[in-house]
């Protein structure tokens, strides 16, 4: 049997994430310390203490998710789990590249932080948003967006990641 690890994109972050693993596994603490060093600020403190209003900013979310993902991968590796293949959804592709040995962890932290900054500049806070719509057919999502467009303003159905 083959084993695959798939790393998540942004959106799964929350204040307090991985604090238990940080306290239990030295490799998790090491990864967070390396991320802090690469960023020049404490993503560790932001992940564990917040505030959420700062953690959700994409320039912070992206290195936080990458750090958490790679730290979890390292714990699994220490426990004897080795994937035959790795992949990632959106931002998770960077975690997969680190797990595959293609990209250095600290370089990846820096790159996704810059990626997040540029994304935030492109769409400043309060100027737009994305929402995950679950369990609706594509056609219904498009129809609802069109109804909103007719009454409120510009809403587009994009990034269809899976059926329903």
Features from the language model and the residues they span:
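A broad detector of short, well-ordered amphipathic alpha-helices
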Residues: 33-34, 67-71, 93, 106, ...
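Short amphipathic alpha-helical segments at helix-loop
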Residues: 53-57, 96, 100, 125
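Alpha/beta catalytic cores of group-transfer enzymes, especially the acyltransferase/condensing modules
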Residues: 10-13, 39, 100-164
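Helix-rich "cap/lid" substructures immediately adjacent to catalytic or cofactor-binding pockets
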Residues: 2-87, 151
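Short, glycine/charge-rich beta-strand/loop segments that flank catalytic centers
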Residues: 53, 87-91, 128-132
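Gly/Ala-rich beta-loop-alpha elbow adjacent to hydrolase catalytic centers
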Residues: 69, 84, 88, 92, ...
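Basic, gly/Ser/Thr/Pro-rich low-complexity segments located predominantly at protein N termini
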Residues: 14-16, 21, 45, 93, ...
């Amino acid at each position: 049997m083959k084993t695959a690890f798939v790393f998540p994109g942004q959106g799964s972050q929350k204040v307090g994430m991985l604090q238990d693993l940080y306290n239990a596994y030295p490799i998790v603490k090491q990864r967070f310390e390396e991320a802090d060093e690469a960023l020049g600020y404490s993503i560790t403190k932001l992940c564990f203490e917040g505030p959420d209003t700062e953690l959700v900013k994409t320039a912070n979310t992206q290195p936080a998710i990458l750090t958490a993902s790679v730290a979890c991968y390292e714990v699994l590796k220490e426990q004897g789990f080795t994937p035959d293949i790795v992949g990632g959804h959106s931002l998770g592709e960077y975690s997969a590249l680190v797990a595959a040995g293609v990209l250095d962890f600290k370089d990846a932290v820096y790159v996704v932080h810059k990626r997040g900054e540029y994304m935030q500049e492109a769409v400043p806070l309060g100027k737009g948003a994305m929402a995950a719509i679950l369990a609706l057919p594509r056609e219904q999502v498009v129809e609802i967006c069109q109804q909103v467009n007719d009454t409120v303003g510009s809403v587009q159905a994009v990034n269809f990641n899976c059926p329903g």
